[in-house]
UniProtKB/Swiss-Prot annotation:
One of its GO terms (biological process) is translation. PROSITE patterns: RIBOSOMAL_S19. GO terms for molecular function: rRNA binding; structural constituent of ribosome. InterPro entries: Ribosomal_uS19 (IPR002222), Ribosomal_uS19_bac-type (IPR005732), Ribosomal_uS19_CS (IPR020934), Ribosomal_uS19_SF (IPR023575). The keyword Manganese does not apply. Keywords: Ribonucleoprotein, Ribosomal protein, RNA-binding, rRNA-binding. PANTHER family: RIBOSOMAL PROTEIN S19P FAMILY MEMBER, SMALL RIBOSOMAL SUBUNIT PROTEIN US19M. The gene is rpsS. Belongs to the universal ribosomal protein uS19 family. It comes from the Bacteria. This is Small ribosomal subunit protein uS19. One of its GO terms (cellular component) is cytoplasm.
């Protein structure tokens, strides 16, 4: 179910503070966050945000086409190792 339009998009306040602080400073560094639920705003474009996937922080460079999506969409939490291979040589006769 989509979020109500009257509520507007959501971004954690602590993440917005970090983005504003880095926009004001000359120094560009990776911004660490645990907020996978935050919506990407146009003010995030050009920043690298390290999003937590449950094990480590994965850096995501925010581009223009990512606006409106959630940060968690770009960092998978599960590692797919493939399906079990069929062993046809040792099959029953």
């Amino acid at each position: 179910m989509a979020r109500s339009l009257k509520k507007g998009p959501f971004a954690d306040p602590h993440l917005l503070k970090k983005i504003e602080a880095q926009a004001d400073s000359e120094k560009k560094s990776v911004i660490k966050t645990w907020s996978r639920r935050s919506t990407i705003f146009p003010s995030f474009i050009g920043f690298t945000i390290a999003v937590y996937d449950g094990r480590k922080h994965v850096p995501v460079f925010v581009q223009e086409d990512m606006v409106g999506h959630k940060l968690g969409e770009f960092v998978p939490t599960r590692t797919f190792k493939g399906h079990k291979a069929d062993d046809k040589k040792t099959g029953k006769k």
